[in-house]
Amino acid sequence: MKKLLAFFTLCLALTTAYAHPQDGMSPEVLIHYFIKAFNDENIPALEEVYAFPHVKIINGKLTRFDTKETPVYDFVGLKKTGWKYTKINQIKVLAEGANSALVELNFSRINNDNKDYFQGVAYYVLTKDMGYWQILCLSTMGVVPGVK
């Protein structure tokens, strides 16, 4: 009986070890989770939110990120703009299928004086290739502080 209990405990531990925070999240909830990880400057969580490879199209310039070795965001540069945190104004799921989704995020950058110093819209193409939602592509129509 003790061996059986130990076996089930081991199985549970292994199952939990391979779980991802975004398991069971909807596309909208993933974007909320992403912004929280961004505001916390939680690089490991941000690396889990993004699929690799992924692309960013910022102001018409395409950048491909093949591995986690390339920083996903420039927090040093972002803080130089006075950034304190990013606020979600609105999230719209524009399209959602079984394994892909398109999400529009209207957001603001808030500075140390708690003032909105930048407002923008970003579009996220999400994939569920690994069984949970991840960002495959980020696109903005203009330059966004802190986004490479």
Give each language-model segment a name.
Residues F34, L46-E47, H54, V103, ...:
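Hydrophobic pocket/interface hotspot
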Residues V72-D113:
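Surface-exposed, charged secondary-structure patches
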Residues K115-Y117:
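Beta-sandwich strand segments
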Residues Y50, G60-K61, L105-R109, A122, ...:
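A mature extracytoplasmic/lumenal domain signature
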Residues L4, F8-E48:
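Short, low-complexity N-terminal intrinsically disordered segments enriched in polar/charged residues
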Residues V55-F65, T81:
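A short gly/proline-enriched turn/hairpin at secondary-structure junctions
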Residues I35-D40, A51, V55, V76-K80:
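Sec-exported extracytoplasmic/periplasmic mature domains
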